[in-house]
């Protein structure tokens, strides 16, 4: 069992740009102390390479099934016939069906330790909302989730399971908050940026509430490194390419950062390419601008330097709702800027074809988000020499995404 999280800030070849306040208005940086547990703020700005995982969180990891398996995609290899070996880390075995639980458990623990009785968050496809709902239940907290309206209407099964875990769920934009009312109309698809604004506003409007972010912030990425730290131990050989999908960056970071850190320190993975795969509907790494921008739609949170499409960008509704985000985490953005991470983007049709192929060859129905990584793996397997090795993170299953598969098939 992993007993430390990895913080890539200690090994970055350039200084990570700090959050900053906008030129006008109250301090957003000061706002963080009102919405986040103090331990998480310390982690966000830490330069320490290793952060100890509290025993209570390690126990929770054991309860939900960590470590997760690393598997070889032998069926997919045979179907492709390229002579490339393919491994995948499978986070879908966790109770909520995705990697999101890794940081939800940690954040719920710190919120409880900080005296919170209620937590609030945003969710796109519902994986993060489910993770927060379960983590809150396990640590005795109430949970409120603002779910992008397009997913609230289409991902009804995840909505049901969030409520099963005890959460209150609102479609976003909602009429519950001023941020929601500003964008509200019944046919608005919502965005993660708007949902973040609603969750933060909700936390600020009450007592003993904390906000739990699902991605983008550095401590979220740090908690997810349990994935990559396990994978480094499990991989029988170093890959020529390590691949994961990107929404805000926590899934990609969780799988690749321990490997990237070793490469930066000269301790291994020298030949490995790190490939970040995003949805064509939200191509922040491939088409965005590297600049300071708000991580939420309304501008409640501090500005961070990242690749962004603009905080007012509303991506079109797609099956991979968890990737419908306008920006990427600061550390991931810096690594992309430095050329250490290679970005790719794919249209929905190509991604769903890859998802179906994987289901028919490996027996696992992948989440549409995770299928973006599979799409890239198929292309890489055709381009790399025989005998090459690819490893990717299968961040979640798609058993609760039947609507996406039904529309595609």
Swiss-Prot record:
Which UniProt keywords are present, listed alphabetically? Amino-acid biosynthesis, Aromatic amino acid biosynthesis, Lyase, Pyridoxal phosphate, Tryptophan biosynthesis
Q: What is its EC number?
A: 4.2.1.20
Which residues are reported to carry the modification N6-(pyridoxal phosphate)lysine?
100
What reaction does this enzyme carry out catalytically? (1S,2R)-1-C-(indol-3-yl)glycerol 3-phosphate + L-serine = D-glyceraldehyde 3-phosphate + L-tryptophan + H2O
- Gene Ontology MF annotations: L-serine hydro-lyase (adding indole, L-tryptophan-forming) activity; pyridoxal phosphate binding; tryptophan synthase activity
Q: In which pathway does it act?
A: Amino-acid biosynthesis; L-tryptophan biosynthesis; L-tryptophan from chorismate: step 5/5
- Domain of life of the source: Archaea
In the UniProt record, which is one GO cellular component term? cytoplasm
Q: Which cofactor does it need?
A: pyridoxal 5'-phosphate
Q: How does it assemble?
A: Tetramer of two alpha and two beta chains.
Q: Which family does it belong to?
A: Belongs to the TrpB family.
The record's listing under NCBIfam families reads:
PRK12391.1, trpB_rel
What does the record give as the function of this protein? The beta subunit is responsible for the synthesis of L-tryptophan from indole and L-serine.
Q: What is this protein called?
A: Tryptophan synthase beta chain
Q: Which organism is it from?
A: Pyrobaculum arsenaticum (strain DSM 13514 / JCM 11321 / PZ6)
Gene that specifies this protein: trpB
């Amino acid at each position: 069992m992993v007993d430390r999280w990895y913080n890539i800030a200690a090994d970055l070849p350039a200084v990570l740009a700090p959050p900053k306040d906008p030129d006008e208005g109250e301090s957003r940086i000061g706002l963080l102390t009102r919405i986040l547990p103090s331990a998480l703020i310390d982690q966000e700005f830490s330069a320490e390479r290793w952060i100890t995982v509290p025993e209570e969180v390690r126990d929770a990891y054991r309860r939900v099934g960590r470590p997760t398996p690393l598997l070889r995609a032998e069926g997919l290899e045979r179907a492709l016939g390229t002579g490339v070996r393919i491994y995948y880390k499978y986070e879908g075995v966790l109770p909520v069906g995705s990697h999101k639980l890794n940081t939800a458990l940690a954040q719920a623990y710190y919120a409880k330790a900080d005296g919170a009785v209620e937590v609030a968050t945003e969710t796109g496809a519902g994986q993060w909302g489910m993770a927060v709902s379960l983590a809150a239940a396990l640590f005795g907290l109430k949970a409120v989730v603002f779910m992008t309206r397009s997913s609230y209407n289409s991902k009804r099964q995840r909505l049901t399971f969030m409520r099963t875990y005890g959460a209150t769920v609102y479609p976003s934009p909602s009429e519950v908050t001023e941020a929601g009312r500003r964008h509200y109309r019944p046919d608005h698809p919502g965005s993660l940026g708007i949902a973040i604004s609603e969750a933060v506003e909700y936390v600020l409007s009450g007592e003993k509430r904390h906000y739990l972010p699902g991605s983008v912030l550095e401590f979220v990425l740090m908690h997810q490194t349990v994935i990559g730290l396990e994978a480094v131990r499990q991989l029988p050989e170093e890959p020529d390419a390590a691949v994961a999908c990107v929404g805000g960056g926590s899934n990609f970071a969780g799988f690749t950062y321990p490997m990237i850190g070793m490469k930066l320190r000269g301790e291994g993975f020298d030949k490995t390419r790190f490939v970040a795969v995003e949805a064509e509907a939200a191509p922040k790494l491939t088409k965005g601008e590297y600049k300071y921008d708000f991580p939420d739609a309304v501008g409640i949170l501090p500005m961070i330097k990242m690749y962004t499409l603009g905080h007012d960008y509303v991506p079109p509704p797609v099956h991979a709702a968890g990737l419908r985000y306008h920006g990427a985490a600061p550390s991931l953005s810096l690594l992309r800027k430095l050329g250490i991470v290679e970005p790719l983007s794919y249209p929905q049709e190509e991604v769903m074809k890859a998802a179906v192929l994987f289901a028919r060859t490996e027996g696992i129905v992948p989440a549409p988000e995770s299928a973006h990584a599979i799409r890239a793996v198929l292309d890489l397997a055709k381009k790399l020499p025989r005998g090459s090795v690819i490893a990717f993170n299968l961040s979640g299953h798609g058993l609760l995404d039947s609507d996406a598969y039904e529309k595609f098939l």
